[in-house]
Amino acid sequence: MDVYPDSALLLLEQIPHPEKLRGKQRADYVLLLTQARDKNYLDSMQSDSLIKLAVDYYKNGGDNVKAGKALFYYGKVMDLQGNDTLAMQAYLNALAKLEKTEEYKLQGLAYEYIGILNADRKLHKDALDNYQSSVYCFQKAADTLGVIYAYRDIARIYYVEQKYDSVYNY
């Protein structure tokens, strides 16, 4: 999925009659399909009906990784729809599910998106804290690109606050 998201999407779309899938298979399918659409930057991710199936299925189950991932993508869909409040709640719920897992990259992404929402609300201190948490998670995941993006986000906050000396550190 991370390396060849276009191939993953193609394979998922070739599954005959996905509407006949039930239970875990259906939840896994819609979670993977939403993830593939996101990684391919498709506008079709703006519909929340599919990912909501996965959120509802995993919310009471024992798979915190899939529950966290479903909540994260639900947050992204809500963000695309302009519903910042539901997006924030979904990201926070995703972090709550993921906190006892080793899904550090996904945790880092959740912190980053929370930071973006906070920055949009002019809550710069909160956004800075979120971005710093994101750096920590990306470092634990050995995700160099994630660390770079998080540092960029930190620098932007310092720039907006006109703390130019701090901008140069990042």
Describe each PLM feature range.
Residues 1-170:
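A "functional boundary" signal
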